């Protein structure tokens, strides 16, 4: 859990914004959302594999676009 020390004469809005930013960097909300419901291990592996395939296809598309620009 991220901890924020409120500085002297610091407005509440600014401290809240810093806290939200640190929570986002730590990945607290995404972790809570992923643990909200039980997910079977096979589903986790399937989703991870699908995201890896998607990343790979995106990388290939980027490389092909770069090659097409060169010629």
UniProtKB/Swiss-Prot annotation:
GO terms for biological process: translation. Residues 60-71 have a biased composition (Basic and acidic residues). GO terms for molecular function: structural constituent of ribosome. The keyword Ribosomal protein applies. GO terms for cellular component: ribonucleoprotein complex; ribosome. Residues 48-59 have a biased composition (Basic residues). Residues 48-71 are annotated as: Disordered. Keywords: Ribonucleoprotein, Ribosomal protein. Belongs to the bacterial ribosomal protein bS21 family. This is Small ribosomal subunit protein bS21.
